[in-house]
Amino acid sequence: VILTLVMGISSCVSDRRRNVVVDASQPDIDVQLLDVNAYSRPGMETETITGIVIHYTANPGSTAQENRDYFNSLQYSHATEASSNFIVGLDGEIIQCVPTWEVAYASNERNTDTVSIECCHPDDSGKFTDETYRSLVRLTAWLCVKFGLTEEDVIRHYDVTGKNCPKYFVEHEDAWDEFRQNVGQAIERSMEE
């Protein structure tokens, strides 16, 4: 076992695929807010945040930047209403599209009291890359600490609507349970520091 020292608050958590070192402080976030518009960033304030909703893009191989730009383009195409507060890319990069105090069009009736995270994935399985997974654990743990939540408040889009999203975590319940455990361990570790 190789231990990695990370500056800031860190926790070593693992899942069946890899060892994950999580820094529970704020991750690096590339803030690229969408233009305020009726189709992807309505500019409405959220209520008290009571949960974090995990999604997958359902667009294999697409990048965080491509997904962010798609959301922003909806103001011109009027194709649908869709967005997310954050997008985690294939290399673990994080783009913020909508402030956490504003509604994102991602989780139906839970849009007003949750923060949504879209995740890129390389193929049709919906399984995230190691880099995406690590960043997702870190971002989710940081948001939980920020809003006074626990891993029990982290849900899938599936848990709101029954949609097969995020696909891999819906089809592999054990991987979902392990992800939430990883988030819980990171939160716990951050509280000890």
Can you name each region flagged by the protein language model?
Residues 44-46, 78-79, 105-109, 124-135, ...:
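Extracytoplasmic/periplasmic, Sec-exported soluble proteins
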Residues 1-8:
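Bacterial N-terminal signal peptides
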